[in-house]
């Protein structure tokens, strides 16, 4: 597939159409990302003019700028929190019927809130354009 700047994005129909059963770890990751989504949106909105921290582009569409975790990465934050928490790590998750998202269940509200607090105290964000974010080593 090509985008408007003729950058070729690899695309594989067979891979996309294969249904892979999601694991508990997948659902936990999705729920943790969803729990902090409001904070990432607020960060992006507060930036004013969006400029990619890597390539310095500033003429992309708003939706083509991503909020990226760095130093520490999201993965590092997630893993450290899971090591430190004294709360039971959820093993089952809810589904947001409106947006079709994996979310924490109501009974895991304390775990979710602890995660949000930990994340917000320890995260660093940067703005990257879509292309730089997708090419960035995770």
Question: For the regions a protein language model found, what residue spans apply to each?
Answer:
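Domain-exit/linker segments immediately C-terminal to small folded modules
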Residues: 111, 124-127, 133-137
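Short metal-binding segments enriched for Cys and/or His
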Residues: 6, 11-23, 81-104, 135-138
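Short metal-coordination and nucleic-acid-contact micro-motifs, chiefly zinc-binding Cys/His arrays
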Residues: 44-51, 121-125
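Histidine-centered nuclease catalytic patch
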Residues: 58-124
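Helix N-cap and loop-to-helix transition residues
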Residues: 12, 72-73, 129
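A boundary/linker detector
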Residues: 1-49, 57-61
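Short cysteine-rich clusters marking metal-coordination/redox-active sites
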Residues: 52-56, 129
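Cys/His-rich metal-chelating microdomains
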Residues: 58-61, 131-135
